[in-house]
Amino acid sequence: MVNIMEHRHVISALVLNKPGVLQRISGLFTRRGFNISSITVGITENPQISRVTIVVNGDDKILEQVIKQLNKLIDVIKVSELEEKKSVQRELCLIKIYAPTESAKSQVIQYTSIFRGNVVDLSPESLIVEITGSEDKINAFIDLVKPLGIKEMARTGITALARGPKILKPKS
């Protein structure tokens, strides 16, 4: 039976940009038995600091535990949950779609246009499409093109920032 109180949480953490930090974060999740749905890491406007965006599924108790444990790690500067309505959350997906005919290519291009995506590569038998947006938008596009034949796919996982003036920044 699925716990109805369980839902997706997006956690943003500022960490020192140095070797081993991601390993310590993922090790924390492994030791605690928490599953990471997606994780993205990239440098911030300060090259000494990286932003880690982690998506976990669980109830509020799990979220609280994850945030407490992350805050205990020495290289973690600050941690915050990014609520869906109070943040901008995006994912990038590259999809290689089977399209051996002009008709199939035209159909893929039309779908891509509707989803405001881009065709980034074209070969005699396939196209590579770039779709950026919410997880739901990307899943809808995948469902639409699946009957055509997805040859290969890569997703980045979610990255996010708080809306408005709220900023996740190190304490001064």
UniProtKB/Swiss-Prot annotation:
Q: Tell me a GO cellular component.
A: cytosol
**Enzyme Commission number(s) from the entry:** 2.2.1.6
Q: Which CDD domains match?
A: ACT_AHAS
InterPro entries xrefs: Acetalactate_synth_ssu (IPR004789), Acetolactate_synth/TF_NikR_C (IPR027271), Acetolactate_synth_ssu_C (IPR019455), ACT-like_dom_sf (IPR045865), ACT_dom (IPR002912), AHAS_ACT (IPR039557), AHAS_small-like_ACT (IPR054480)
Q: Which residues form the ACT domain?
A: 10-84
A biological process (GO) of this protein is: L-valine biosynthetic process
Short name of one Pfam family for this protein?
A: ACT_AHAS_ss
Record keywords: GTP-binding included?
A: no
GO function terms (MF aspect): acetolactate synthase activity; acetolactate synthase regulator activity
Catalytic reaction list: 2 pyruvate + H(+) = (2S)-2-acetolactate + CO2
Provide the alphabetized UniProt keywords: Amino-acid biosynthesis, Branched-chain amino acid biosynthesis, Transferase
Family membership: Belongs to the acetolactate synthase small subunit family.
Q: How does it assemble?
A: Dimer of large and small chains.
What protein am I looking at? Probable acetolactate synthase small subunit
**What's the source species for this entry?**
Methanocaldococcus jannaschii (strain ATCC 43067 / DSM 2661 / JAL-1 / JCM 10045 / NBRC 100440)
